[in-house]
Curated annotation (Swiss-Prot):
It comes from the Bacteria. One of its GO terms (cellular component) is plasma membrane. The lineage of its organism: Bacteria, Bacillati, Bacillota, Bacilli, Bacillales. Belongs to the EzrA family. Residues 24-564 are cytoplasmic. The keyword Transferase does not apply. One of its GO terms (biological process) is septin ring assembly. It is found in: Cell membrane. This is Septation ring formation regulator EzrA. Residues 84-126, 165-223, 271-303, 350-435 form a coiled coil.
Length: 564
């Protein structure tokens, strides 16, 4: 037994030793990979990358930057790469002692150092590339500025006439660029690449702005010397022609405004010669705005004349229509008021319209006289005609409404008479149905309702014979009688249906009298109520009795009555 225990312990020990050696083997692989990475990092061309700057002019800012980066290289190597070998050796020694955790810590530290080394290397690559690219950009801008400088100089020399008095200031500005180009060369030769970049970039912007000025100046000069003076002349002679045609353009003040604009225009060329183009553009914009205002006023007058010619015919027709309609209304009112009641306000409105129409005709005659003058301000004429058109339109609408009212009086009277005849006919028809029904007698309330309708009809007929008729009152009374008639008919129909239904229920219930005492008793009561014209109560008692012996039968009987 002891032997087995000893053997088991030995097996466990052997397994533990095997595991330890296996773990050490894995860690040794990690150390080998760390060693391989160190070798790869040592191959990074840190110094070779920095040597790219030696092709530049190593002075000034470039030299300072180069020295700083070279110093950083040394510090990076000493601080991050040199300790890596020591970390790897420490890890190997700890691994031999089976101190796996401590060995792993050394390996991790080694990787962190190499990560930082690689990061510094990439940062240096970026810095070197930025410096080289900035030098290239500086050279490209410099070459562009030189080309632009020569072209601008030739352009002013060859096309001096296009620039007018601005040619000399342009030449002076262009000549100022030569020392600035030389200044760039000095900064470059001194190795101050950042200052050189700022200088050449600013110079490129200045040249670009001056080139845009050179493109703009000929256009401004042409507008100042030719286009605007030509527009002044065209506007002046155009207004003279329009005045000959009969336009009153005194309110436009063409001559005075043009003279004022000429004075303003005289300040523009000196501004251009001083290269004050923003101020020159503002001045020209102001001149053009004032020209547009005058053109708008003149165009408004021309359009106003056309509208006046179109509106005159319309207003003439509208005034004639208003006058004719007013005469017709006065005649109709005198005729109609013999038969119908007319509000005095309507008659007064017609007389007021007559005065207004006459006043509008007088105003219209004055306007026509105004248009026959040698000089006419058509915008004012148009405003006056618009007022006339609006006013006469209102009068025509009101007079049309009044005429429709007079026509409606006759139609309303005829409609009221027709409705009254229908009421009389319908009343007699309903009463005949009541008399011919199975009712023991016509209920008293229907006799009362019939008499009330007869009385109302007689009163209305009396009013129809009176003159003048108050149509609205008649129409309202007839409408009230129609409502009474509808109520009379609806209630009569209800009574007739209830009477038939009650009779059917009693007749059907007779079959149960012998065998069901309570049915016989209830039907006797229903018959009594029927004779007293209390049909609804008779129905309730008969329904209750029949439902007690034959459920659902009353519904069936009711449906049959409705169908009949």
């Amino acid at each position: 037994m002891v032997l087995f225990i000893i053997l088991a312990i030995l097996v466990v020990i052997l397994i533990a030793i095997g595991v330890l050696f296996y773990m050490r083997s894995n860690k040794r692989n990690l150390i080998e990979k760390t060693e391989e990475r160190k070798n790869e990092i040592e191959q990074l061309p840190l110094d070779d990358n920095l040597r790219k700057l030696t092709g530049l002019n190593l002075k000034g800012e470039t030299k300072t930057k180069y020295d700083a980066m070279k110093k950083d290289n040394t510090e990076t190597t000493n601080k991050y790469l040199a300790p890596v070998e020591e970390k790897i050796q420490n890890a190997e020694e700890l691994l031999e002692k089976f101190k796996f955790t401590a060995a792993q810590t050394e390996i991790d530290d080694a990787h962190e150092l190499m990560d930082q080394y690689e990061e510094n290397y990439q940062h240096q690559v970026t810095q070197v590339d930025d410096i080289i690219n900035l030098h290239k950009e500086n050279e490209a801008l410099y070459e562009k500025c030189k080309v632009d400088y020569r072209e601008m100089k030739r352009d002013v020399l060859a096309n001096r006439h296009q620039f007018g008095e601005a040619a000399e200031p342009l030449e002076n500005e262009i000549e100022n660029y030569e020392p600035k180009l030389n200044e760039y060369e000095n900064l470059k030769s001194e190795g101050n690449y950042v200052q050189a970049h700022n200088h050449i970039a600013a110079l490129e912007d200045q040249i670009k702005n001056l080139k845009s000025y050179m493109d703009e100046i000929p256009e401004l000069i042409r507008e100042t010397q030719k286009e605007l003076p030509g527009q002044f002349q065209d506007l002046k002679y155009g207004c003279r022609d329009l005045k000959v045609e009969g336009y009153d353009l005194d309110h436009v003040k063409v001559d005075g405004t043009i003279q004022s604009l000429k004075t303003e225009l005289s300040f523009v060329e000196p501004m251009i010669s001083r290269l004050e183009l923003d101020e020159a553009n503002n001045k020209l914009e102001n001149i053009n705005d004032k020209l547009d205002e005058m053109y708008d006023l003149i165009e408004y007058e021309v359009k106003a004349k056309n509208e006046v010619e179109e509106t005159k015919d319309i207003i003439t027709d509208d005034l004639f229509k208003a006058k004719d309609m007013n005469y017709t209304l006065q005649t109709e009112i005198e005729y109609v008021r013999e038969n119908y009641y007319i509000n005095e306000s309507d008659a007064q409105s017609v007389r007021q319209f007559e005065n207004e129409i006459q006043s509008l005709i007088s105003v219209y005659d004055d306007i026509l006289k105004e248009t026959s003058k040698s000089a006419v301000r058509y915008s004012e004429v148009q405003d006056n005609l618009q007022y006339l058109e609006d006013h006469v339109s209102v009068i025509n609408k009101e007079q049309d409404k009044l005429q429709n009212h007079l026509i409606q009086l006759r139609e309303d009277e005829a409609e009221a008479e027709d409705n009254l005849l229908r009421v009389q006919s319908k009343k007699e028809e309903v009463y005949r149905r009541l008399l011919a029904s199975n009712l023991t007698s016509v209920p008293e309330r229907f006799i009362i309702m019939k008499n009330e309708i007869d009385n109302e009809v007689r009163e209305v007929n009396e009013q129809f014979r009176e003159r003048p008729i108050h149509v609205k009152q008649l129409k309202d009374k007839v409408a009230k009688i129609v409502i009474q008639m509808n109520t009379f008919e609806d209630e009569a129909n209800d009574v007739l249906v209830n009477a038939v239904y009650a009779e059917k229920l009693i007749q059907y219930g007779n079959r149960y009298r012998k065998d069901h005492h309570h049915v016989d008793k209830s039907l006797n009561e229903a018959e009594r109520l029927f004779k007293n014209n209390r049909y609804k109560r008779a129905i309730e008692i008969a329904e209750e009795a029949l439902e007690s012996v034959e459920p659902g039968i009353t519904k069936h009987i009711e449906e049959q009555v409705i169908k009949e």
